[in-house]
Curated annotation (Swiss-Prot):
Localization: Cytoplasm; Nucleus
Complex formation: Interacts with EIF4G1, EIF4G2 and SLBP; probably tethered by SLBP to the 3'-end of mRNAs ending with the histone stem-loop, it also interacts with EIF4G1 which is bound to their 5'-end.
Domain MIF4G: 3-205
UniProt protein name: MIF4G domain-containing protein
Gene (name only): Mif4gd
Chain coiled-coil ranges: none
Key word Membrane present: no
Protein source organism: Rattus norvegicus (Rat)
Pfam families in the cross-refs: MIF4G
Similarity comment: Belongs to the MIF4GD family.
Gene Ontology molecular functions: identical protein binding; RNA binding; translation activator activity
This protein's UniProt keywords: Cytoplasm, Nucleus, Translation regulation
Amino acid sequence: MGEASRDEYKIQSFDAETQQLLKTALKDPGAVDLERVANVIVDHSLQDCVFSKEAGRMCYAIIQAESKQAGQSVFRRGLLNRLQKEYDAREQLRACSLQGWVCYVTFICNIFDYLRVNNMPMMALVNPVYDCLFQLAQPESLSREEEVDCLVLQLHRVGEQLEKMNGQRMDELFILIRDGFLLPIDLSSLARLLLLEIIEFRAAGWKTTPAAHKYYYSEVSD
């Protein structure tokens, strides 16, 4: 789908003033407080998982616009500082809001997917993203379908990139996932199916084989 047809960036859920702020940041970043923009985007991402899936694309566009206009990175710095702050408080976030936690993981993985330095993923985000995924692979998280679903979706999205950046941690993560699949913890049938699917997805080189696609998607639809 072309960029022009997607320029709304799913910001309809913001109030009119904030929508205008974001639109200005995309077109004329020097005219707005970019640290405020970063905080607005993170705040909304923690509350709205639909937006958190889109936010990386918007952040990338603002970073590109600011770099082109002024050769600066005020927005990126503000965004990364706020991500670090939320990362440091992730255990409290998970304890008080499961939805906020899932939205945060979705958001940081989305940012990792979109932000590039010299056409490479940002090294500064590799370990924080891994740490979040490791938490999702703990037994108490695997007993919650929302966390299993988040884990599998994010590995589909950024697993291959993460493995290229640090293969040892990916091996360790999948040991946890396999243990969760095999050990007698309280896994729902859907969670067990999702874990098996991601194990086979990685084993096939981060690709879904036609047979696997047919099997898993028929199972989920049933």
